[in-house]
Each structure stands twice: as structure tokens, then as C-alpha cells.
């Protein structure tokens, strides 16, 4: 009988898109698989990914992650052409695809990548159905965040 693999402590998150939550209202989140090549998996294990400018496009009833950068390792194979900005296919159920395509086409939403992470041995992408924020919405968010910090500071000093 084989031994169980030891749990590796640490974060399963490979990359996050913090800008997305600042620039968009995230209405709904989905988890999607990601179709990768071998060198991309090795680079993701090393944490060399950037999804800050990535979004999802739809072609022929399929979803593709566009704009994500996976930097190849220096020791990558020479007979494989490593394309860091390659468009990668997202693996979703038909029902989820239909829902996303409908929201993008009818309601004017966009779909952005929020994070890339490991789930067991699989790389998953958390995507969000989003609507763009206006400048005044961003300012309101900043005001709310600052007031929350001030309120916590006031309550801390009031309890002394």
C-alpha cells in the first residue's frame, strides 16, 4: 500500500487580480478549470503568473482566458516554443457557459479573472461576472474603507 502524501503548508493561491475588485462590481463568481501545457504547469508551481490584465472571451460556444501571462522558466525545454501570453481555454460546464454568455451579451457584463489557485493537483481559475465602476463609485469605496478604519481606531481608544 502506498503512503499518503504529506500535506504541504502554504497558500494554494498562485496569483490574484486585486485590481479587478477595485475597478468592477463583482456580481457572481465561478470556478473554471484551465487547459495548460507542461511548461506552464511548471511555471505555475514556481509562482510565475500574472493575471492583472486578463479577461474572458467567448468564441464558438467556448470560453478562453485572454491576457494572462505565465512566464516560462529559464530551464524550459528548447524544442517547445513557450508563448507567455497564449490564449488558454477555460473548462466550464455547458450550463455555466450558457449563463456567462447570456449575461455578457444581454446585460452588458464582462467576465474577469479574479485568482488562479491549486485545487488538489488541478489549476483552477476563479472568474467573476463584473460590471465596471465609475469614478464616483471608486471614491465612495475609498471613503467607506477610510471611515471603517477611523471607526475601529475610535472604538479602540474609547474602550481604554
Swiss-Prot record:
PROSITE patterns assigned: SSRP
Any single Pfam family the record assigns to this protein: SmpB
InterPro entries registered for this protein in UniProt: SmpB (IPR023620), SsrA-bd_prot (IPR000037), SsrA-bd_prot_CS (IPR020081)
GO CC annotation terms, alphabetical: cytosol
Disulphide bond pairs: none
Compartments it resides in: Cytoplasm
Superkingdom of origin: Bacteria
GO terms under biological process: trans-translation
Family matches, as Gene3D superfamilies: 2.40.280.10
Entry keyword annotation includes Transferase: no
Sorted UniProt keywords: Cytoplasm, RNA-binding
Free-text function comment from the UniProt entry: Required for rescue of stalled ribosomes mediated by trans-translation. Binds to transfer-messenger RNA (tmRNA), required for stable association of tmRNA with ribosomes. tmRNA and SmpB together mimic tRNA shape, replacing the anticodon stem-loop with SmpB. tmRNA is encoded by the ssrA gene; the 2 termini fold to resemble tRNA(Ala) and it encodes a 'tag peptide', a short internal open reading frame. During trans-translation Ala-aminoacylated tmRNA acts like a tRNA, entering the A-site of stalled ribosomes, displacing the stalled mRNA.
Protein family (similarity comment): Belongs to the SmpB family.
HAMAP family linked: SmpB (MF_00023)
Protein name: SsrA-binding protein
Originating organism: Yersinia enterocolitica serotype O:8 / biotype 1B (strain NCTC 13174 / 8081)
